[in-house]
C-alpha cells in the first residue's frame, strides 16, 4: 500500500492577459491629433473623416477636435469621425 497519497496536478489554471480593448474617447469628447479613439479586433467601427486606421484596426485622431460616432450606409456600419474644433 502507498504510504503517501497520490496528488494529481491540474492541467487548468491559466488565462490570457486582458487586452484593454474598447472605446477610449466617447462621442462629443475633445481629443488631440494622434490620440486613440477605439481599440478593437477587426473593424467593428470604421474610420471616418479626420481619423486613421492602424494595422491592428485601432482608430486614431488625425486632427484636434470632437469625436463623432455615426451609422451610415445600407449595411449600418458605424463610423468614427473627428469634427475639427
Curated annotation (Swiss-Prot):
Disulfide bonds: none annotated. PROSITE patterns: RIBOSOMAL_L27. Pfam families: Ribosomal_L27 (PF01016). GO terms for cellular component: cytosolic large ribosomal subunit. SUPFAM superfamilies: Ribosomal L27 protein-like. GO terms for biological process: translation. The keyword Cell membrane does not apply. InterPro entries: Ribosomal_bL27, Ribosomal_bL27_CS. Keywords: Ribonucleoprotein, Ribosomal protein. GO terms for molecular function: structural constituent of ribosome. NCBIfam families: L27 (TIGR00062). Belongs to the bacterial ribosomal protein bL27 family. PANTHER family: LARGE RIBOSOMAL SUBUNIT PROTEIN BL27M, RIBOSOMAL PROTEIN L27. This is Large ribosomal subunit protein bL27. It comes from Cellvibrio japonicus (strain Ueda107) (Pseudomonas fluorescens subsp. cellulosa). The lineage of its organism: Bacteria, Pseudomonadati, Pseudomonadota, Gammaproteobacteria, Cellvibrionales.
